[in-house]
């Protein structure tokens, strides 16, 4: 029996080491985001290994793209303080998807409307679990978050004169979204910036379907071109800003 327990413990240890190694390799292969980077009027706030975008609106309000990893929202609140604002100034939070490192501080902003694609609402609210190889290992529990506005693909939400166009990019999760505002395309985890500056798709270990993610990015590029969108920058949640749409177009050309 002791020998069996030792063997099981060894297997578990090997699995843990392997998972940690894969996760570390995944993040080391990305170009890290820069805290305080400003693009298209938005400011990037790094929150641990994730990031949040603060988009200024009129009348002293802001919108957030995602809500970070830290449940206290410390990094976001510090940025608001820098602007002489408090938590009540957050009018809306656009969630790219429902993984924990993107919804952490939602509860810190009671005045905010919570927006996400309809297909992502069950994951955000904790009614279902994520299906990626690593996320599926975690238990499914209610998050205490209520999405107050379920969005449709292609919808435009205008806040204080700032339009946010919604693009469905399923693959990383079932209802992953990208948002285009002031020429900046916020893609969450659906794309990343590699060390060499090229655009790469969502990492397989965290994603429901890497193949679907790839198809979605190709379709996203086609739709942006068809819409005549003036994309000045692409902002992933876990990696550096990419200027213009060139890297997305290169990715799409290579994966059609």
Please provide the spans of the model-predicted regions.
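Active-site HxH/HxHxD metal-binding segment of metal-dependent hydrolases
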Residues: 71-74, 81-149
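Binuclear metal-ion centers of metallo-dependent hydrolases, dominated by the metallo-beta-lactamase
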Residues: 242-256
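Internal catalytic-core helix/loop-beta-alpha segment
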Residues: 148-161, 166-168
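Metallo-beta-lactamase
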Residues: 163-168, 174-246
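Zn-dependent metallo-beta-lactamase
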Residues: 2-61, 246-247
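Hydrophobic "anchor" residues on beta-strands that sit immediately upstream
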Residues: 62, 93, 113, 185, ...
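Divalent metal-coordination and catalytic microenvironments
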Residues: 55, 66, 97, 114-117, ...
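Conserved beta-strand hairpin/beta-sheet module of binuclear metal-dependent hydrolase folds
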Residues: 33-83, 178-193
């Amino acid at each position: 029996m002791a020998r069996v327990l030792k063997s099981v413990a060894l297997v578990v240890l090997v699995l843990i080491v392997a998972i940690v190694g894969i996760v570390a390799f995944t993040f080391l292969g990305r170009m890290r985001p820069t805290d305080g980077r400003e693009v298209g009027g938005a400011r990037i706030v790094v929150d641990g290994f994730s990031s949040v975008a603060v988009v200024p609106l009129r009348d002293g309000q802001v919108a957030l793209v995602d809500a970070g990893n830290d449940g206290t929202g410390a990094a976001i609140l510090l940025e608001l303080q820098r602007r002489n604002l408090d938590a009540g100034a957050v009018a809306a939070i656009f969630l790219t998807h429902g993984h924990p490192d993107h919804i952490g501080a939602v509860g810190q902003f009671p005045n905010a409307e919570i927006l996400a694609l309809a297909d992502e609402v069950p994951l955000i609210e904790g009614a279902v679990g994520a299906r990626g190889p690593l996320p599926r290992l975690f238990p499914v529990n209610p998050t205490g978050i209520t999405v107050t506005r379920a969005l449709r693909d292609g919808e435009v939400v205008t806040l204080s004169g700032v339009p946010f166009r919604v693009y469905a990019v399923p693959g990383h999760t079932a209802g992953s979204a990208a948002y285009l505002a002031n020429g900046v395309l916020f893609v969450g985890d659906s794309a990343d910036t590699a060390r060499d500056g090229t655009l790469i798709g969502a990492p397989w270990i965290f994603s429901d379907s890497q193949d679907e993610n790839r198809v979605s990015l190709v379709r996203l590029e086609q739709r942006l071109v068809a819409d005549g969108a003036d994309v000045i920058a692409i902002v992933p949640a876990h990696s550096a800003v990419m200027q213009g749409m060139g890297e997305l177009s290169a990715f799409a050309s290579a994966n059609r």
